Amino acid sequence: VSGLDTILGGHTHDGVPLPIPVTNPEGAVCLVTNAGSNGKFIGVMDMDIRDGQLKGIKYEMAPVFDNLIKDAPEMMSYLTDLGRRVYDENIVESRSKTYHYNKARIGKTFSQILNEKLAIAPDLLYRRGNFMGSWDQLICSALTYEYSSDISFSPGFRWGTSLLPGQWITMQDVMNQCAVTYGETYIQEMKGKQVLGILEQVADNLFEPDSYLQSGGDMVRVGGLKYTISPESELGERITDVVILSSNKPLVANDVYKVSGWAVVGDHPSGRLIWDIVKDYILRHKNNENILPLEPINHPTIKGMISNEGISGYQGELI
């Protein structure tokens, strides 16, 4: 778009420390900024404008420390009142009538529900890997356990806060990762070629060379199988070497597999809500010291990106 000098990005999940220069068809440069998610930073740009022209800029990401900022009385009052609200049968958590409300929560305040301590994190719990994160692995493991599925899918959401090793995992932390209006889960049978098609389609949404055809988000999170991805290949050629972990055998196009997942936007499934499945999984699998053992993160192998600086520090295999 011609005539724009700067775009201050407001919808992002990655803090970008310096503006990105983008050249338009006329040769002019537009500076694009993004300051990250969850209120961690405020993007601050000082512009030197003289004679009707932009002469220069100074940009920084100012960190936000909540213990250095005075609480807004009106907001604190609102949050306190909300925390005192009592959960009842009029609460609607699910689009499925079976799970409109949770009987186990009736009579408890919102604060009591959200502050429940579930287990202690033994390692960093994070969401924002391009292909997988430890929170994602936990969600996929919970789905696989709930439904005894061969494969589990979880959306590549780009939000959710991290927990440090040794911190308690509370119900609020689980909700931070799962709280959407379409949290119902499902179990269904799929042929191997359908599973491969899902992986290929999501990968195309992310890595389509034409940015106007990209859908955003991260790669779908997968439990129960491993695969190799070539981001720079074309649709239908990006996903290879797909192996079912439980059998250590290749995915077969016409074989049928049990697949679990959640976050269906259209016709809603009727399964339990994902946050209850994750909560129950944590409570069942923590040890006597309240520590939750975490399964190894199922990072895919990435092909053809070794020299790409954006993949620096990748915890999976690069070939």
Residue ranges of model-derived segments:
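Metal-dependent catalytic neighborhoods of phosphoester/phosphodiester hydrolases
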Residues: 1, 16-25
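Glycine-enriched alpha-helix->loop->beta-strand junction motifs that scaffold or abut catalytic
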Residues: 2-4, 28-29
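Active-site neighborhood of phospho(di)ester-bond hydrolases with catalytic His/Asp-centered motifs
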Residues: 5-15, 32-35
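Catalytic centers of hydrolytic enzymes
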Residues: 29, 35-319
